[in-house]
């Protein structure tokens, strides 16, 4: 049985993370629809600040987006080896946004996604914790992508 190298494993984690955030123009996908707005970057562009601020099934899209931004920033730090305690309650403190805040969250998500991707490349194989953090952030982001997609679907039903 052929074994996968750690570099290949990190590359695959990055590929799944890419699909979570950007449109990957392949004839196939790992888990998202194969269209430009399937990942976070494109999907969040399809709604405005007012829509993002609506409470849908207990939380807003803005809440999830802020949590994603916060989580990405912390994941990059974790993968790089800084395991200082974090106040995760802070990651849910935003529930509504204005246009400027919504633009900033989306820009920060894009930058933080790249920071996580870079941290995976530079430190993802440096320790069990780093690799676990890399795998964990992929799963975490896939969950929130699905949650936001469901909230948008519910919002558009009404």
Positions of predicted regions on the chain:
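Short, contiguous alpha-helical
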Residues: 1-25, 29-37, 41-44, 49-90, ...
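Acidic/histidine-rich alpha-helical segments that form the ligand environment
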Residues: 93-142
């Amino acid at each position: 049985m052929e074994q996968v190298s750690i570099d290949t494993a990190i590359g695959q984690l990055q590929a799944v993370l890419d699909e979570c955030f950007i449109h990957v123009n392949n004839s196939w996908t790992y888990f998202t629809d194969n269209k430009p707005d399937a990942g976070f970057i494109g999907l969040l562009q399809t709604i405005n600040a007012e829509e993002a601020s609506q409470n849908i099934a207990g939380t807003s899209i803005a809440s999830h987006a802020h949590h994603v931004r916060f989580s990405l920033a912390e994941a990059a730090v974790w993968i790089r080896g800084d395991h200082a305690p974090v106040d995760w309650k802070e990651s849910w403190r935003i529930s509504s946004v204005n246009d400027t805040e919504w633009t900033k969250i989306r820009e920060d998500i894009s930058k933080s996604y790249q920071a996580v991707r870079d941290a995976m490349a530079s430190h993802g194989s440096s320790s069990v914790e780093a690799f676990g953090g890399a795998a964990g952030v992929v799963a975490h982001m896939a969950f929130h992508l699905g949650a936001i997609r469901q909230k948008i679907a519910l919002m558009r039903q009404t």
